Every structure is written in structure tokens, then in C-alpha cells.
């Protein structure tokens, strides 16, 4: 069909989320080393245009909502050449401790998340 397989978008979301974390000085593995886990509990993608094989894309990642033990990442997949939005999506995550039960987001992580400017990722 000449375009990317639909499930690849969720892989791109994961890669973009990891890059977002690394840009702020922590890796997901750092959370696991501390006994925390941040599983995806909900995911959505709305396809607005196709991504063709070998097309260069960018994924804009923002945190749009923070709750006591959960946070939402939003993603916008754009064609790097034209800026056209191809896909918009989000993932909800719940912070869990080693007992695999939801726990409050630690103060230092919450502070970092609250410093992040919330913005509309669909605005170029």
C-alpha cells in the first residue's frame, strides 16, 4: 500500500516519549532502577494523513495533563518537509511502585513535569 503500518505510530510515540525524557535529564530505565514503572494504560491515534515509507517525520511530544498518579503525553506526527500533520495521538500512564500499585508522582518528578511548558502541539 506504500504507507506505514498503523501500529508503527505507537512505536514512534514510545520513541518520542523516551527522547522527551532524555532531553529532561532522565531515562525510563532510571525510573525502573528506583522501583517505579510507568505503563501505558490508554493509547489513541487519529490518522489525518498518510506517512509513506522512507518519508522523514518528526514527532512533537508534550505533557498535557498531570494527575496524582497519572500523566498524559500528547503526540503530533508531522511530515518534516511540508509540516503537514499526519497523526495526532496520546498515551495515558500510571505511575506504579514495586508492588505494581498506583502511587503518587514523587515531588522531584512532579517538579520537573510542572516546569514543562504546556502548549498546543498542533501549532508549528
Question: For the regions a protein language model found, what residue spans apply to each?
Answer:
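Hot-dog-fold acyl-thioester-processing enzymes
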Residues: 1-40, 97-124
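Hydrophobic aliphatic residue packing
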Residues: 3-4, 40-41, 59, 77, ...
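Hydrophobic beta-strand-centered segment that forms part of the acyl-chain substrate-binding groove
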Residues: 20-71, 88
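HotDog/MaoC-like acyl-thioester-processing domains
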Residues: 51-56, 64-124
Amino acid at each position: 500500500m506504500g504507507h506505514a503500518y498503523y501500529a508503527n505510530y505507537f512505536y514512534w510515540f514510545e520513541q518520542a516519549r523516551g527522547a522527551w525524557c532524555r532531553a529532561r535529564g532522565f531515562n525510563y530505565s532510571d525510573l525502573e532502577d528506583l522501583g517505579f514503572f510507568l505503563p501505558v494504560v490508554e493509547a489513541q491515534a487519529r490518522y489525518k494523513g498518510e506517512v509513506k515509507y522512507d518519508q522523514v517525520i518528526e514527532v512533537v511530544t508534550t505533557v498535557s495533563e498531570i494527575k496524582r498518579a497519572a500523566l498524559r503525553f500528547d503526540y503530533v506526527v508531522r511530515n518534516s518537509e511540508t509540516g503537514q500533520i499526519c497523526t495526532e495521538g496520546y498515551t495515558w500512564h500510571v505511575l506504579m511502585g514495586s508492588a505494581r500499585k498506583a502511587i503518587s508522582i514523587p515531588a522531584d518528578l512532579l517538579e520537573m513535569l510542572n516546569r514543562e511548558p504546556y502548549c498546543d502541539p498542533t501549532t508549528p
